[in-house]
């Protein structure tokens, strides 16, 4: 469907039937940007927060400060905007496959694996985009596995029926032996939205296709989830760790000269 929509939209754009502010056929040609993806980027650049969820958003901000690595399939800048408005240290952002080949610090980092509104052509929306994403999804799995060594992984707002989540989980479970898989099962949690459920329903699901058991928490009360994670005492914030890691790395490099 995405491929069809892009084809139709770009055709109408080139024929002058559709226009975009500050973006014309010349700019599309010079930058190699798909008008369809440009339109999506412009749409998701703007967002409004519902006053009804202010308390939940504040809890979300506090939770973000406890995270080491964040992976998201969202195009918008909601996560980085809220993180940076709360922390004196900015989160480091990687878009698409960028960062998976880099020697990153592993703290206060955001990986936007389906692209970002800042870079319209990185947006994953067409069949070709998803095929390319699937080919490189093992990189995401490698990043998750390296993170699991030190910290648990929490999927928030996704479902086990989500194709992307299943692909990511399957990629790394298929590479593990039974002992390693058991270690994984104790450290991965999926928090799934369940309308009308104010409490937390915890289940352990044995998924034969994924080849592992998963802890699944179902709830509508995400504020409670955010508050609980925010209470974790790490001793020092991930942003602080990244700051000092950079200093230590620089000292080691300078010492080696």
Segments the model singles out, each with a brief description of its role:
Residues 54, 128-143, 171:
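Active-site glycine-rich loop that binds ribose-phosphate moieties when present
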């Amino acid at each position: 469907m995405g491929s069809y929509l892009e084809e139709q939209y770009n055709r109408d754009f080139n024929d002058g039937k559709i226009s975009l502010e500050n973006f014309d056929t010349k700019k599309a040609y010079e930058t190699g940007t798909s008008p369809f993806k440009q339109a999506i980027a412009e749409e998701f650049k703007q967002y409004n927060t519902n006053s009804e969820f202010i308390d939940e958003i504040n809890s979300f901000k506090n939770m973000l400060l406890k995270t080491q690595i964040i992976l998201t399939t969202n195009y918008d800048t909601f996560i980085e905007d809220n993180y940076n408005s709360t922390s004196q240290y900015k989160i480091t952002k990687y878009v698409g496959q960028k960062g998976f080949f880099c020697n990153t610090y592993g703290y206060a980092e955001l990986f936007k694996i389906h692209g970002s509104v800042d870079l319209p052509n990185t947006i994953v929306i067409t069949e070709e985009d998803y095929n390319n994403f699937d080919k490189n999804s093992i990189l995401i799995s490698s990043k998750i596995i390296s993170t699991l060594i030190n910290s648990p992984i929490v999927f928030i707002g996704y479902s086990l029926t989500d194709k992307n989540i299943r692909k990511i989980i399957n990629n790394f479970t298929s590479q593990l032996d039974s002992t390693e898989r058991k270690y994984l099962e104790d450290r991965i949690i999926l928090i799934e939205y369940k309308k009308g459920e104010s409490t937390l329903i915890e289940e352990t699901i044995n998924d034969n296709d994924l080849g592992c058991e998963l802890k699944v928490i179902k709830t509508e009360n995400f504020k409670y989830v955010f508050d609980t994670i925010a209470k974790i005492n790490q001793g020092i914030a991930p942003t602080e760790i990244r700051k000092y890691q950079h200093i230590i790395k620089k000292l080691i490099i300078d010492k080696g000269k």
